[in-house]
Amino acid sequence: MDHIETAILNCYGIREAEQNMVFAARLTQHGHTIQNMADLMDLYHQSYSQKTIENIVGLPHPTVQKFMVITVAVVGASRRFLAQITRHQNEVKYMSASLQYSNYSGHAAFAIPYGIMKADKEIQDIYKKSCQSDLDHYAELCALGIDHDSAGYATPQGLRNVLIISATPYQWKHMIGQRTCRRNTDETRIVMLHIWQRLYKLSPILFAPDLTGPFCQRGSCMEKQMSCQNPISKLWIPSDILKADYPLLIRREVSSHKD
């Protein structure tokens, strides 16, 4: 699962999300003081502290976290990840590269699952050979005049993709909480941990572990008999989870930075 990159396309959106959240919460208590638009704008631009944000995000009123969307780009994750993450449909929108309109002949690449990355070279070669064979057949079909959409059925699930995800802060926290659980697939966990890491860096209060992480970080596991029985420390931030669960990726990242 190396060579997967994530980026927040509208970093300003997090600041606006915080401001809108505070404004919406204050509005419920100051309706009697607002006589005109000028009064409303004064309330909107009223300053606030990080403690104010902390108090509001801890309340059981998620609507105030839904007045802004944060857009994230994911480059290099597989189309299998696409199939999994798009199960989330509330307050979230997606735009993906298209097999119908794109010609991947000579340009396609495939993701390597973390389990295969850890395996012996012989196993890695079997996987790579299988994926490359599929991509070669795809290119051959396109060269024979088959349309890209039809030829796309020959591509492997591991085909790398480009995906844009736009969601409210509340929905990001919901998706991250569900998809960073240790019962999820490695690729989905890795992508969502990287996204969480970027969001946490910009707003460690809004995306704190006890508000964003899997059930075991927020309180206790809700999977009951399906629990992995290996809870994540409530103190860990996303980078700590990546280091503990995916050390091979961290070593490769460090090595690439040195190079």
Residue ranges and their predicted role:
Residues 1-259:
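Family-specific signature for flavin-dependent thymidylate synthase
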